[in-house]
């Protein structure tokens, strides 16, 4: 079963102003079980868009993000989840238990076993670019149309034959304003989905890898810990770049997931921190 919209090859965005309430309703829908998902790609794409907000180039009433930047981040974000933690990203469909991105990474590591232990950004540039092209070509046709449809054309316009997506200016403003909240909710929904498709043995292995003696409260927190370790701990929260110097430990009150102190701060690089405070 494929989610509705997955085979759409292009789509425009809704004309006119879009309220914050509408965006919250749409994001909550996408994070809920009502939005059909066979893979974690929708969460991965939302994460990539958030990571690229500062890389978008202004156009009339919209902001352009190239597929190269979008799926460069997408590939980088999935790399450790798949290669280091062996986390399955797809509900088995009878044909395969692995999503396309897992298949691409596994094929690469079969060719170059040494890549299994290095960060995505350390893969030699020519091979890394080839992987991003393959991920972009294979994954975009399954997720860009589906997420466009889920957001009722409010988030972006796209053409799969084009060079990227055009973020709606209202969507850009909303995602920038509520980046922290959206990011946390996205992790939470992603972790819930991972919990559904990965069995007990994976959780046990994760606990070893994360050096956690016992699961905290429930298995779900383990998956959230992985996502936090990978995406936030050493990265600028705003642009996603690796932090060479941690400029600020930015405390942000977090009202959605109250029990978790870990989720109450973000790290930013100097330039984003300065931009953010302007």
Predicted regions and their residues:
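Active-site catalytic microenvironments for nucleophilic, acid-base chemistry
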Residues: 52-56, 242, 271
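Short, charged/polar micro-motifs that form catalytic or ligand-binding hotspots
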Residues: 31-39, 226-229, 255-259
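Histidine-centered nuclease catalytic patch
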Residues: 1-4, 237-267, 276
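Betabetaalpha-Me/HNH-type nuclease active-site subdomain
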Residues: 4-8, 196-245
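Mixed-charge, low-complexity interaction segments
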Residues: 12-219
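Short metal-binding segments enriched for Cys and/or His
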Residues: 6-12, 265, 272-278
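Short metal-coordination and nucleic-acid-contact micro-motifs, chiefly zinc-binding Cys/His arrays
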Residues: 42, 228-234, 261-265
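Structured loops at beta-to-helix junctions and adjacent beta-edge loops in soluble globular domains
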Residues: 2-6, 49, 270
């Amino acid at each position: 079963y494929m989610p509705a919209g997955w085979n759409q090859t292009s789509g425009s965005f809704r004309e006119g102003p879009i309220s914050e309430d509408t965006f919250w309703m749409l994001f909550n829908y996408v994070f809920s079980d009502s939005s059909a998902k066979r893979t974690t790609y929708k969460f991965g794409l939302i994460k990539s868009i958030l990571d690229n907000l500062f890389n978008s180039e202004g156009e009339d009433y919209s902001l352009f993000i190239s597929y190269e930047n979008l799926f460069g981040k997408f590939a980088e974000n999935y790399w450790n989840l798949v290669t280091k933690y062996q986390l399955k990203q797809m509900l088995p469909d009878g044909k395969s238990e692995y999503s396309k991105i897992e298949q691409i990474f596994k094929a690469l590591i079969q060719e170059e076993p040494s890549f299994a232990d290095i960060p995505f950004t350390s893969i030699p540039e020519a091979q890394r670019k080839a992987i991003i092209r393959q991920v972009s070509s294979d994954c975009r046709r399954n997720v860009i149309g589906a997420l466009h449809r889920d957001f009722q054309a409010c988030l972006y316009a796209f053409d799969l034959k084009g060079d990227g997506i055009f973020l709606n200016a209202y969507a850009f403003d909303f995602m920038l304003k509520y980046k922290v909240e959206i990011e946390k909710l996205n992790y939470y929904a992603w972790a819930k989905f991972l919990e559904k498709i990965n069995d007990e043995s994976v959780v046990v292995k994760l606990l070893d890898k994360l050096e956690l003696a016992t699961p905290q409260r429930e298995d779900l927190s383990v998956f959230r810990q992985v996502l936090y370790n990978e995406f936030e701990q050493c990265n600028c929260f705003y642009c996603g770049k690796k932090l060479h110097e941690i400029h600020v430990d930015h405390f942000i009150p977090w009202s959605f997931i109250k029990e978790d102190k870990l989720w109450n701060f973000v790290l930013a690089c100097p330039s984003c921190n300065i931009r953010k405070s302007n």
